[in-house]
């Protein structure tokens, strides 16, 4: 597998996004993106802790991968919640967390929040994850359109996050087949919130390396007016330098 990544603060004074790529042959390959929230001190701490707990708890080879991934999310939620209670400066902190464990012919994805995972197969982009957000619920119920959601005053309000104490914690899990030449994009809403799917598909269709694809996506997001941190992480099921 090949991968590339960009994680930058964009037009924000501080970067509260985080990302993780684990390609250690001793463990299952893992990729993840987390977008922290909770103020100057807390946002980056929430995303960093979420990724740390995810990494530490997805290394066991004796547990069904989907169960291990779901358990890691619960532990990450507990850890972020505990830290927010321990440190008054981090009160109310939280984070999104989207991730994927990779296997030769499939991957298992998990998501909480509005960071996204897209699959790209044979020139076609598909959003795999479902945004846990207020506006996505309005779209699902038919109250607003996808286009209206982009400009809604509550478009940044998420309904699930790592660090939540509201009711039973739930993680969305997805089992997706993938073949040689397929790729996966994990990103924060600093990217997906401003780029159309056609924009992303066009760049992933070009014969660039995953790193160049990520850089082009981030540059286009800035050009289109992103005011948030921007993270793009592409994993390609290919041994070649390019992926398309």
What does each model-identified segment do?
Residues 1-244:
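PP2C/PPM-type serine/threonine phosphatase catalytic domain
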